[in-house]
Design a protein with these regions (language model features):
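Conserved C-terminal structural/oligomerization subdomain of aldehyde/semialdehyde dehydrogenase
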Residues: 13-22, 205, 242, 296-297, ...
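Residue-level signal for inorganic ion chemistry
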Residues: 17, 53, 75, 97, ...
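ALDH superfamily catalytic-core signature
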Residues: 215-356, 419
Length: 462
């Protein structure tokens, strides 16, 4: 089942297969209206004080809390996220608004330089209308983690959301309007690929931010580059989760299961390749399989369920093909490996063992509830295996040796390293990757400055 046709985007409940809504693609005139509104909104918004913008963020956070259950239910219905996790996404998004409202203004203060007598400073100015192309897996968080700092910097934000979460896109826009966000400062348009190209090439778009697949990011990045538009790309990941012999086994297994199966495995920065030192490999594998088997799968609106359906039917088919290919290549299937028969787009929690670097499960991103376990001979071997990937988003190390962990972190080719804990995005730290995981950073002051005109102001230079 596709989530789009030539004429419209389809919102389909993956737990039932029921079509929730069909929304026509925006035509050229509607896209022109969205661009015009965003451009006029920017002209006014950039003149507001940072304090005013920060208050708007606080108001957005409050509005999100007021509509928390409604928003969570929409997320769960449209993309299948277990309801407890959907509620947590709303809570995290509201907290993001508060964090930037409190800490962001200071990050926009003029920055001193080493020029004598403070004659030169760096100013962070608004850039313009930012086009955001966002995915379905965190339909609220992914939008706001870019939009909140973009708005605080004085830019306007124009969203093109994933076609299977148009209900979430509409609700986000409604909540921000209710919070008092001025017209044109935040907008969204249901654009298809041609519409996206129209917007990227329009001179009113100053920059583009994309979270999505490598293929989509490369295509959009190429268009943005041809138009000389700045672009931030947050793309795929096949993150290594290293477990060394001296690791706290119970803690490592708990983090591994949470890190792999949250959001039914549909997380770009999730642990996907479990690289375990051979002295602890069997014990880790046994406990991991038992813990994964104990996860409850079913209706994502039922509180007790840990795993819901995969969001898209085509991606379940692709994942199953990757699992089958890996088994044919020699991987050992320890758990799952099958589509769940009946209503809904469910895929069993799956564990593959004896995975080697030449196999599909090691080389490709597995975007679903599938874990691949690879045995490393020693720590240096584990490090080499971790870096043997075209991706470089995040990595995890479990060890009792803090010195070794720090040394390994310095040599891991990725944007984030988590020691004795699984990866996550957090407003307080930068998020992003290297290699084919993309470039640029979101969150913290890095995400705030990404879409600023970093302007040098130098007085009395002779």
């Amino acid at each position: 089942m596709t989530m789009m046709t030539a004429t419209q985007a389809l919102s389909v409940n993956p737990a039932t297969g029921q079509t929730l809504a069909a929304m026509p693609w925006a035509n050229a005139q509607e896209i022109e209206h969205a661009l015009s509104l965003a451009a006029s909104g920017f002209k006014k918004w950039k003149l507001t004080s940072v304090a005013q913008r920060a208050q708007t963020l606080r108001d957005i956070g409050q509005a999100l809390r007021a509509h928390a259950e409604e928003m969570a239910q929409c997320i769960t219905r449209e993309m299948g996220k277990p309801i407890k996790q959907a509620r947590a996404e709303v809570t995290k998004s509201a907290a993001l608004c508060d964090w930037y409202a409190e800490h962001g203004p200071a990050m926009l203060n003029p920055e001193p330089t080493l020029v004598e007598n403070q004659q030169a400073v760096i100013e962070y100015r608004p850039l313009g209308v930012i086009l955001a192309i966002m995915p379905w897996n965190f339909p609220l968080w992914q939008v706001l983690r870019g939009a909140v700092p973009i708005l605080l910097a004085g830019n306007s934000y124009l969203l093109k959301h994933a076609p299977n979460v148009t209900g979430c896109a509409q609700m986000i826009a409604r909540i921000l309007t209710e919070a008092g966000t001025p017209a044109g400062v935040y907008g969204w348009v249901n654009a298809n690929n041609e519409g996206v190209s129209q917007m990227i090439n329009d001179p009113r778009i100053a920059a583009v931010t994309v979270t999505g697949s490598v293929r989509a990011g490369a295509a959009i990045g190429a268009q943005a580059g041809a138009a000389l538009k700045k672009c931030v790309l947050e793309l795929g990941g096949s993150d290594p989760f290293i477990v060394l012999n001296d690791a706290d086994l119970e803690l490592a297994v708990k983090a591994a299961v949470a890190g792999r199966y949250q959001n039914t495995g549909q997380v770009c920065a999730a642990a996907k390749r479990f690289i375990v030192e051979e002295g602890i490999a069997q014990a880790f594998t046994d406990r991991f399989v038992a813990a994964a088997a104990a996860l409850k799968m079913g209706d994502p609106l039922v509180e007790e369920n840990d795993l819901g359906p995969m969001a898209r039917f085509d991606l379940r088919d692709e994942l199953h093909q990757q699992v089958q290919a890996s088994v044919a290549e020699g991987a050992r299937l320890l758990l799952g490996g099958e589509k769940i028969a009946g209503e809904g787009n469910y895929y069993a929690a799956t564990v593959l063992a004896d995975v080697t670097p030449d196999m599909t499960a090691f080389r490709q991103e597995l975007f679903g509830p599938v874990a691949a376990i690879t045995v490393a001979k020693y720590a240096e071997h584990a490090l080499a295996l971790a870096n043997d990937s075209e991706f470089g988003l995040s990595a995890t190390i479990f060890t009792a040796d803090d010195t070794l962990a720090a040394e390994m972190a310095a040599r891991l080719e990725c944007g984030g390293v988590f020691i004795n804990g699984y990866s996550a995005s957090d407003a307080r730290v930068a998020f992003g990757g290297v290699k084919k995981s993309g470039f640029g950073r979101e969150l913290s002051h890095f995400g705030l400055h990404e879409f600023c005109n970093v302007q040098t102001v130098w007085k009395n230079r002779v």
